[in-house]
């Protein structure tokens, strides 16, 4: 690891980092990210103990510049003790239909009727109470992302698998049952805050703060650049923006991520749409 890091500055960031770190890339910084997390992590004792479960058999990684991917894979394999394979381009991370549509579609299903002052008497478990309505919504989002990938036919996006393929279920009921049965998902709660009479959505949860602004929004912006409509994804994003307008709490606006073009999406090259 020492030899790999001696000649370069290395940073490990999330799959949208190529957009926000253009200046760093110009200075020779290597940016890399994982397509999916190695495992599910749960906090047991704050600041002391985290329990990890459901480890994947292998990981996939992309880097900028692309030629650094192999070295980055070696670094991750060494650090985590598991195989890691390079992806063809960083877009294989940015457009992967994981949490950016999995979490956001579920949150829309659970809180689509939310309004200021509304209190929920009960919040279902996030995964164990997964229902077919959520799956149908998720399938629409998944199909839209796949259509976007097919439109970008000049790029090798073979690393982006649909959620149906990823979970091995193509029918709504079977997919819902699969999500409910995953052992590492057991007991995971819907992000909520206890209040008088029940619960409120916890907008500070990473399910909200990360997966909308730095996940779903980026997919929509790539679609915007490619002139490919993603109506279901946009509906969910518009819902989130419509009631969550405080810039201090809403990264979508706080980071300049609006419905229109944003400063680091001014060119096609800025999202890696050029080999």
Map each language-model feature to its residues.
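Broad structural signal for hydrophobic residues in well-ordered alpha-helices, predominantly aliphatic
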Residues: 16, 20-21, 76-77, 222
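Secondary-structure boundary elements
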Residues: 22-23, 67, 78-83, 147-155, ...
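Short secondary-structure capping/junction motifs at helix and strand boundaries
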Residues: 26-32, 83-87, 155, 229-231
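Conserved beta-strand termini and adjacent loop/short-helix elements that scaffold enzyme active sites
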Residues: 34-36, 87, 160
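Substrate/ligand-engaging "lid" and interaction regions
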Residues: 38-141, 261, 266-274
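NAD(P)-dependent Rossmann-like dehydrogenase/reductase catalytic/cofactor-binding core
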Residues: 116-121, 128, 135-275
């Amino acid at each position: 690891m020492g030899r790999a890091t001696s000649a370069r500055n290395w940073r490990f960031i999330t799959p949208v980092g190529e957009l926000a770190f253009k200046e760093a890339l110009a200075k020779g910084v290597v940016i890399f990210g994982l397509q999916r997390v190695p495992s599910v992590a749960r906090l047991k004792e704050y600041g002391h103990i985290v329990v990890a479960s459901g480890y994947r058999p292998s990981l996939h990684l992309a880097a900028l510049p692309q030629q650094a991917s192999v070295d980055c894979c070696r670094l991750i394999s060494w650090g985590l003790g598991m195989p890691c394979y390079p992806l063809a381009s960083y877009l294989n991370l940015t457009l992967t239909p994981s949490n950016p549509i999995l979490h956001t579609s579920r949150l829309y299903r659970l809180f689509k009727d939310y309004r200021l002052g509304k209190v929920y008497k009960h919040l279902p478990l996030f995964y164990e109470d997964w229902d077919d309505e959520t799956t149908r919504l998720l399938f629409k989002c998944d199909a839209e992302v796949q259509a976007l990938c097919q439109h970008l036919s000049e790029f090798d996006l073979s690393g982006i698998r649909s959620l149906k393929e990823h979970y091995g279920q193509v029918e709504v009921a079977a997919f819902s049952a699969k999500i409910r049965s995953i052992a590492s998902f057991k007991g995971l709660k819907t992000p909520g805050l206890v209040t008088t009479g029940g619960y409120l959505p916890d907008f500070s949860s990473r399910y909200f703060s990360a997966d909308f602004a730095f996940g779903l929004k980026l997919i929509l912006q790539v679609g915007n650049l490619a002139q490919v409509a993603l109506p279901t994804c946009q509906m969910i994003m518009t819902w989130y923006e419509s009631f969550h307008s405080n810039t201090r709490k809403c990264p979508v606006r706080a980071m300049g991520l609006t419905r229109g073009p944003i400063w680091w999406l001014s060119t096609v090259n800025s999202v890696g749409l050029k080999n």
